[in-house]
Amino acid sequence: MALIKELLGKTPQIGADTFLAETATIIGDVKMGSECSVWYNAVIRGDVNFITMGDKVNVQDNAMLHCTFEKFPLIIGNNVSIGHNAIVHGCTVHDNVLIGMGAIVMDDCMVESNSIIGAGSVVVQGTHVKSGEVWGGIPARKIKDISTELLDGEVNRIANNYVKYSSWYKVAGEKPEEILDL
């Protein structure tokens, strides 16, 4: 069972139909929407400020979500994928966003809807990623505008797939090959 810890009188609020891996950690002032998933060794730490997450947010293995004391909460919209080993800290991420594996999004950043932060990128403090942009690099910069194919083929596909993956883990006593119809 995941570690869900009350801190300073604040208990995480977990949305309906959410999957929490056994080694996931959720602490303090955290509010999650429905159909979210928090995977193995991911940490969501609402200890020094609050964290809100919309519906269909997946926080993949080893990701770290945190906020900044007395300055920046972490606000995440709907249909957001946060890749393996990513760090998302004290920023705002709107709807339909993919934050790639190992990416870092720092304090006071704004990532608008329908955007992608490429794997391994570092979005430095105070950066504003506008809607429909793809950013990458260290420090991250705009690479291009997002296409419909990229939005549907990556951002939406990954978010939807993680809802499906989490259903596999919620089904007790069934073999994955039976669930997948293999």
Residue ranges and their predicted role:
Residues 1-13, 47, 53-55, 61-64, ...:
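Glycine-rich hexapeptide-repeat left-handed beta-helix
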Residues 14-58, 62-68:
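A positional/architectural concept
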Residues 81:
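Short proline/glycine- and basic residue-enriched helix-capping loop/turn segments at helix->loop/beta transitions
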